[in-house]
Each structure stands twice: as C-alpha cells, then as structure tokens.
C-alpha cells in the first residue's frame, strides 16, 4: 500500500482558536510543510478560495491539495440544500485536484463553542439515522461523480463522536461514503483504532494522524470542559508522543485497507 504524506495547516494556525497561531502566515505554514518533507496540504481559513490563486500558492511550494474540511448539516438538512451548500467548495476542490473532500457533521456541533461542554453535544440516536445515511450516500455519490470522493470525519463535539456512532453511520451509508479515520479523535471518544480498521478498512480513504496525552485525557471533565478547552490543555500531540500504538495501526492498515494509493496525514 502506497501512502502519501500531507499536512494540515491546523498544526500552525487553529481557525477556531486565533490565539493558537492566528498571526502565523500561510507562507510560513506552506514553506515549513514542504521543508519537513510533506507532499500535500489540507486547506484552512487562510487559503485562497479562488481556484487559480489556490493552485498558484500550492505550486509555489510544490504541494498538492490533499483535502479540506466541509461543514455539513445533512443530519438536519435536505439533500438539495446540501448540494447547493457544498457546490462552491466541491468545484474548487475539483479544479485544483483535491484527493478527497472531508465531511464533518456540524449541525448543533459544540466543537467550536468554548462555552459548551463536551457532554452537551448532539447525539446521533436523536436523529433518523437511516434517512441520514441515505442523504449522505447520495451526497457522496454526487461528489464521486465530480471526481472528488467524500470522506466522513467522526469528530469530538459532533453527533458522530463515538465508535458506536461511527459504526451506525457506516452501516447506514453506501460504499460511496468513505471513512476518514482520525486516530486521535477516536481515542479521545473512547474508541479503538484497531477495531475500526478491522471493521471498516475497506471504507477508509483518508487518515488524520495525531496522538493523545493520556494524563491530560484522564483529567478532562466532560460535563464542564469544552472541546476547545481540551485542545488548549494539550490533549492532542504528535504521533509517537502519546498513548496511541502506531506500529499496530500501520500493520492493520496493510491488512485491511485495500485502496492502494491514498493520502495519509
């Protein structure tokens, strides 16, 4: 299995927490990404939205467009409205040659609300999962037809946070809905990366690799602290610096993930 290594600009600048790198320039982010040996990047708030401008800034640094976050609301939205909502970003990604588009379910999310504790997030069980799965599959099929596969990002603070919720979404959706396995978010939510790879390896078309500091995780009060509070406390760290076994993840990925060429970062 061939893996391409990309980077996320959130390592330099957090769009939800301007105090974390808000004054770091896009030039610094991209030049250091390439200097570190990565061949691609995701988008972020500082990236151009014009396709020609985006292509130019990427080419200047010899970087490909890996992907970028899309704030979806299909769990409480109709398909036609969602198709209209995603259209500009999908067209941008298509023109610049993104490998995938990252779908995060953000209806009533608390991921970017520092005044809301983690426990106040929406719960998947409160929605019609079967209907959600049908809409999500249709959206993913549309993205695939446009040449930009969709990858679903389970995320802390959203309606799809836990391993059980992720399992339910995978069961309710068709093959067009790829899975972005975020190793750090899954462990933060109490999940098992090895189990998810074994169950859903054929659906994984993108990775986010980060690590978790066990001591910080153990001290989190989910009824009092927000996701952004946890970020500021340092719950996340770089792969190899925390509690996640990446040797095991890589070995299992070689067994269970069939797609030969996908970005991994």
Functional labels for PLM-detected ranges:
Residues 2, 31-35, 49-67, 88-98, ...:
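Acidic (Asp/Glu)-rich catalytic clusters
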Residues 10-12, 44-46, 70-74, 106-108, ...:
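Active-site beta-loop-alpha junctions enriched in small/polar residues
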Residues 11-24, 74-82, 121-128:
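Active-site mouth loops of central-metabolism enzymes
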Residues 18-32, 82-92, 189-197, 246:
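Short, acidic/polar
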Residues 20-24, 108-118, 217-229:
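Short, flexible, mixed-charge acidic loops at enzyme active sites
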Residues 41, 133-243:
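Acidic/histidine-rich catalytic cores of soluble enzymes
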Residues 79-178:
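Active-site acidic/histidine proton-transfer and metal-coordination neighborhood
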Residues 255-265:
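Single conserved hydrophobic/aromatic residue that forms the stacking wall/gate
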């Amino acid at each position: 299995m061939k893996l391409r290594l990309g980077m996320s600009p959130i390592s330099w600048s957090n769009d939800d927490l301007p105090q974390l790198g808000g004054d770091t320039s896009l030039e610094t982010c991209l030049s250091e990404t390439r200097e570190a040996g990565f061949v691609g990047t995701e988008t972020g708030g500082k990236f151009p939205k014009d396709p020609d401008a985006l292509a130019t800034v990427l080419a200047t640094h010899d970087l490909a467009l890996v992907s970028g976050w899309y704030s979806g609301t299909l769990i409480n939205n109709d398909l036609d409205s969602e198709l209209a909502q995603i259209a500009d970003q999908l067209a941008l990604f298509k023109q610049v040659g993104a490998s995938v588009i990252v779908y995060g379910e953000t209806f009533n999310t608390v991921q970017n609300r520092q005044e809301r504790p983690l426990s106040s997030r929406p719960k998947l069980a409160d929605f019609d999962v079967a209907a959600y799965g049908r809409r999500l599959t249709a959206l993913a099929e549309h993205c695939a037809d446009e040449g930009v596969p969709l990858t679903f990002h389970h995320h802390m603070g959203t309606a799809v946070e836990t391993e059980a919720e992720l399992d339910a979404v995978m069961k309710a959706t068709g093959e067009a809905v790829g899975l972005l396995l975020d190793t750090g978010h899954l462990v933060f939510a109490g999940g098992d990366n090895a189990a998810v790879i074994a169950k859903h390896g054929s659906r994984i078309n993108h990775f986010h690799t980060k690590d978790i500091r066990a001591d910080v995780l153990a001290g989190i009060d989910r009824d009092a602290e927000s996701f952004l509070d946890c970020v500021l406390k340092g719950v996340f760290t770089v792969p190899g610096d925390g509690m996640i076994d990446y040797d095991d993840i890589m070995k299992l990925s070689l067994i269970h993930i069939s797609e030969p060429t996908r970005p991994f970062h």
